[in-house]
Amino acid sequence: MPSLRDIRNRIGSVKSTRQITKAMKMVSAAKLRRAQDAILKTRPYAQLLEQTLGRIAARAAADEVVAHPLLAPRAQRTAEVVVITSDRGLAGGFNANIARRTQRFLVENADRYERVQLATIGRKGRDYFRARRLEIRKDFTGVHANLAYEKAEAIAAEYTERYLSGEVDAVFLAYNEFKSAISQKPVVFQLLPIETPPDAGDGASIDFKYEPSREALLRDLLPRHVAMQVWRALLESAASEHGARMSAMESATKNAEEMIASLTLQYNRARQAYVTKELMEIVSGAEALK
């Protein structure tokens, strides 16, 4: 049976842990609000850009014209999956869920492509796949530190260049899609070639006038669209990470409080037993002296 000192030490240790988890929960909640604000600010621009590109692509398809190489279908022999995870842990199943979703995607598409490569954004994903001896073509380091749109642009530009050169035939983004603070959905999204939305053909019958030209607009807008998709995935992943960590730390804080209550009860019972034993010894000694 543990001594009173041992129980006191355990209570103190759990209280210290509770302070840490409570502080981490508050920090994650603040970061989550900022990430949500960034997503809301980005969404209108991304939606309008997607609609505009969809109309131009649909009109080009109606004219039986290949509008741009990024939109043109071709034989897909080599694919690459860019997996977005976090640099830090203590986020529940955030990293494990997207890693397992990626592995399932690799199995499901093993016959579709001659070769599927992996790239990672985030140390947790890199470590996960290395531990399973899966080759990682490239690890994008330092992306999560001071997350900025310029980093998304650089990643998008690299994959656009590799796609246009024929080095890779399809590029996918694997990330956690943010639903709420307690819900994140692991998804695999096709980045390249660009897929037009299902309702893109709604504006194909309207004879829009594009200046300087349809082709010039696509040359300018398509790289922005690819960069925006990468940026959106990074923001969604960041919000999902903070939400998952906030939930995990809230659960850890509650568990710590329950453990403190249990240890306190154990301490009081042990102390009561100790006092009772002392009193009995005193009474027994007094009786022996009579």
From Swiss-Prot:
It is a peripheral membrane protein. Keywords: ATP synthesis, Cell inner membrane, Cell membrane, CF(1), Hydrogen ion transport, Ion transport, Membrane, Transport. It comes from the Bacteria. Its main location: membrane. One of its GO terms (biological process) is proton motive force-driven plasma membrane ATP synthesis. GO terms for molecular function: ATP binding; proton-transporting ATP synthase activity, rotational mechanism. One of its GO terms (cellular component) is plasma membrane. InterPro entries: ATP_synth_F1_ATPase_gsu, ATP_synth_F1_gsu, ATP_synth_F1_gsu_CS. It is found in: Cell inner membrane. Coiled coil: none annotated. PROSITE patterns: ATPASE_GAMMA (PS00153). Gene3D superfamilies: 3.40.1380.10, ATP synthase, gamma subunit, helix hairpin domain. HAMAP family: ATP_synth_gamma_bact. Produces ATP from ADP in the presence of a proton gradient across the membrane. The gamma chain is believed to be important in regulating ATPase activity and the flow of protons through the CF(0) complex. F-type ATPases have 2 components, CF(1) - the catalytic core - and CF(0) - the membrane proton channel. CF(1) has five subunits: alpha(3), beta(3), gamma(1), delta(1), epsilon(1). CF(0) has three main subunits: a, b and c. Belongs to the ATPase gamma chain family. This is ATP synthase gamma chain.
